[in-house]
């Protein structure tokens, strides 16, 4: 049976991956929801207006929205379907993306209810990355500790000859 750690990583990976595929698709096409698509268009226009550096670099709201949407879809697919290290890399890119989105929301002065989902999914991405990068607990390889006092060697037996260990 799979360990609880593995089940947690798989569940978070699939849920987060599907969420980002969905959100990225909304940014790319109005087929899923015309209202959400038009809201995304409006929001990204305000992000570009609030950050003139993007205009100087030649990045307009359409390019920004489509590139973020494509990155979300690609990383979401990797998080959902691809095993191993690429999943952690996609997790890291999505975490950076969430931080950028939080920055944009703060920049334009959006209320908390507009970006609360980004906070929650940023925390979930962080948790998934921490759990995935934590080394596996190898309790079976550890030596079993003696259970009774008779099985425990005395301090005298542990100490080198001629020396007594004092603790």
From Swiss-Prot:
Which GO cellular component does the record give, naming just one?
endoplasmic reticulum
UniProt entry tagged with the keyword Chaperone: yes
Q: Which InterPro entries match?
A: TMEM35A/B
Topology in the lipid bilayer: Multi-pass membrane protein
Main subcellular location: membrane
**Which Gene Ontology molecular function entries are recorded, alphabetically?**
acetylcholine receptor regulator activity
**What compartments host this protein?**
Peroxisome membrane; Cytoplasmic vesicle; Endoplasmic reticulum membrane
Q: Where is this region: Interaction with NGFR?
A: 43-54
Give me the Lumenal side stretches, as residue ranges: 27-61, 110-114
- Enumerate the Gene Ontology biological process terms: chaperone-mediated protein complex assembly; positive regulation of protein localization to cell surface
Query: Induction: what does the entry report?
Result: By sodium depletion and angiotensin II in adrenal zona glomerusa (at protein level).
Q: Which residues lie on this side of the membrane: Cytoplasmic?
A: 1-5, 83-88, 133-167
Q: In which tissues is it expressed?
A: Present in adrenal zona glomerusa but not in adrenal medulla (at protein level). Expressed in the hippocampus (at protein level).
Reported impact of residue 46 to A: Abolishes interaction with NGFR
Q: Where do Basic and acidic residues bias regions lie?
A: 135-145
Give the keywords, sorted: Chaperone, Cytoplasmic vesicle, Endoplasmic reticulum, Membrane, Peroxisome, Transmembrane, Transmembrane helix
Described by its record, this protein's role is as follows: Molecular chaperone which mediates the proper assembly and functional expression of the nicotinic acetylcholine receptors (nAChRs) throughout the brain. Essential for the proper folding, assembly, function and surface trafficking of alpha-7 (CHRNA7), alpha-4-beta-2, alpha-3-beta-2 and alpha-3-beta-4 receptors. Stably associates with ribophorin-1 (RPN1) and ribophorin-2 (RPN2) (components of the oligosaccharyl transferase (OST) complex) and with calnexin (CANX), both of which are critical for NACHO-mediated effects on CHRNA7 assembly and function.
Protein's recorded name: Novel acetylcholine receptor chaperone
Biological source species: Rattus norvegicus (Rat)
The coding gene here is Tmem35a
């Amino acid at each position: 049976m799979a360990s609880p750690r593995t089940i947690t990583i798989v569940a978070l990976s699939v849920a987060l991956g599907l969420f980002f595929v969905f959100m990225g698709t909304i940014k790319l096409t109005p087929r899923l929801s015309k209202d959400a698509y038009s809201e995304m268009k409006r929001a990204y226009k305000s992000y570009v207006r609030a950050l003139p550096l993007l205009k100087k670099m030649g990045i307009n709201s359409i390019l920004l929205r489509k590139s973020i949407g494509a990155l979300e879809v690609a990383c979401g697919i990797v998080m959902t379907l691809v095993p191993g290290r690429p999943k952690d890399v996609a997790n890291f890119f999505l975490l950076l993306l969430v931080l950028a989105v939080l920055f944009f929301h703060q920049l334009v002065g959006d209320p908390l209810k507009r970006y609360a989902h980004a906070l929650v999914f940023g925390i979930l991405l962080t948790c998934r990355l921490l759990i995935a990068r934590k080394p596996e607990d190898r309790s079976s390889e550890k030596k079993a500790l003696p259970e009774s006092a008779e099985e425990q060697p005395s301090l005298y037996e542990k100490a080198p000859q001629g020396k007594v260990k004092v603790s």
